[in-house]
Amino acid sequence: MPANRFNGFTEYGVGIGLRIPHYRHILTKKPIVDWFEIISENYMIDGGRPLEVLDKILDQYKVVQHGVSMYFGSASDPDPEHLRRLKQLVKRTNTPWLSDHLCWGSVDGRYTHDLLPMPYT
């Protein structure tokens, strides 16, 4: 198959996860990497060190977002506030794509904070 079978996906190269223990190294050493993956929910906040670091990273790198709490498989609709903050973060990062898990993890507004498998029904 040709390398472009993913409609440009491969043009983004190789990325690594942006995690708190790596902040200092990344900001001081400026490693050669194509992009960083952020966990969306860690940056869906109103200020603070994570957003300060994210803005510095965005000055030099592309960022892609990966979520861990959309719970597409739950019976409830997605939380409108979560979607609002997610949209706000997408605009801030100008991410080329956003991913999340196909799972469930909430019932009646109560969250398990786990990625539970979809039932085989």
Name each model feature, range by range.
Residues 81-121:
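Active-site acidic/histidine proton-transfer and metal-coordination neighborhood
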Residues 2-26:
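Boundary/entry segment of secreted carbohydrate-active catalytic domains
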Residues 25-31, 48-65, 81-96:
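Acidic (Asp/Glu)-rich catalytic clusters
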Residues 11-20, 70-77, 115-121:
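Active-site mouth loops of central-metabolism enzymes
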Residues 12-18, 34-38, 63-66, 96-100:
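Hydrophobic faces of well-ordered beta-strands that scaffold small-molecule active sites
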Residues 20-22, 40-42, 69-71, 102-106:
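Active-site-proximal loop/turn and secondary-structure-junction residues that shape catalytic pockets
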Residues 40-52, 71-80:
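Acidic-and-aromatic substrate-binding clefts and catalytic sites of carbohydrate-active enzymes
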Residues 60, 67-78, 102:
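Structured, acidic catalytic/metal-binding patches in enzyme active sites
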